[in-house]
From Swiss-Prot:
CDD domains reported for this sequence: Tryp_SPc
Mutagenesis / variant outcome for changing residue 151 to N: Found in a patient with chronic pancreatitis; uncertain significance
Cysteines paired by S-S bonds: 17-141, 59-75, 155-222, 186-202, 212-243
Family the UniProt entry places it in: Belongs to the peptidase S1 family. Elastase subfamily.
Residue positions the entry lists as glycosylated: 25, 52, 226
Protein name per its UniProtKB record: Chymotrypsin-C
Outcome of mutating residue 217 to R: In PCTT; results in markedly reduced protein secretion and loss of activity
Length: 268
């Protein structure tokens, strides 16, 4: 009975996922870009850690249920205390209307996470409490298991990462168009070569628009034909030469390769 109840809850969540009350402006960019429309990506969260009595943004993440957040494994440290900010647009405004801060109950890092090779770069955070969904706080859809997107499929990366290489962290949420790069192209020797595996997805690489430091863990948002948005990727790594290096697209953990793992951890 418990399993049926959990499944019913997940299905109910899925039926109302990925539809923001405030549709995004789809012409903006991240590095070298513009601010996102406030609350147009209401599943975007800020993962924050405590240092010297101050909460600091470290990574992005995606709300996929009222008490679960997807992020990257490389964002997690066993020595840090975390909280999750939901419903945020401007990180400089502590008491921003429609936002709240939630403690962390449990963090599941993929047991095969490899920090050297950056493989299985995925973590699931269980929040200390359920958050009430609203116009500013909503959940993203999960992609269908093992699904792939075609070359040049238009997706958007979002986050509060650096505005340019070695630049300042953004106060307001940023967004940027990141067309999908097919695996055959991204794994070419003059692109990412053998470092890119089929459990990853590449997007961008035009040398102009890109994710950057601080965007890690955040979503690659891709819109379905029915208008809803799914988190198809999790920001994993980019080029050391800079945040918007040509032929070095941002590499994302491909969420559709981990659906079974996500479902397993959500039912613990």
């Amino acid at each position: 009975m418990l399993g049926i109840t959990v499944l019913a809850a997940l299905l109910a969540c899925a039926s109302s996922c990925g539809v923001p009350s405030f549709p995004p402006n789809l012409s903006a960019r991240v590095v070298g870009g513009e601010d996102a429309r406030p609350h147009s990506w209401p599943w975007q969260i800020s993962l924050q850690y405590l240092k010297n009595d101050t909460w600091r943004h470290t990574c992005g993440g995606t709300l996929i249920a009222s008490n679960f957040v997807l992020t990257a494994a490389h964002c997690i440290s066993n020595t840090r205390t975390y909280r999750v900010a939901v419903g945020k647009n401007n990180l400089e405004v502590e008491d921003e209307e429609g936002s709240l801060f939630v403690g962390v109950d449990t963090i599941h890092v993929h047991k095969r996470w490899n920090a050297l090779l950056l493989r299985n770069d995925i973590a699931l955070i269980k929040l200390a409490e359920h958050v009430e969904l609203s116009d500013t706080i909503q959940v993203a859809c999960l992609p269908e298991k093992d699904s792939l997107l075609p070359k040049d499929y238009p997706c958007y990366v979002t986050g509060w990462g650096r505005l340019w290489t070695n630049g300042p962290i953004a106060d307001k949420l940023q967004q940027g168009l990141q067309p999908v790069v097919d695996h055959a192209t991204c794994s070419r020797i003059d692109w990412w070569g053998f470092r890119v595996k089929k459990t990853m997805v590449c997007a961008g690489g035009d040398g102009v628009i890109s994710a950057c430091n601080g965007d890690s863990g955040g979503p690659l948002n891709c819109q379905l034909e029915n208008g809803s948005w799914e988190v198809f990727g999790i920001v994993s790594f980019g080029s050391r030469r800079g945040c918007n290096t040509r032929k070095k697209p941002v590499v994302y953990t491909r969420v559709s390769a981990y659906i079974d793992w996500i479902n397993e951890k959500m039912q613990l």
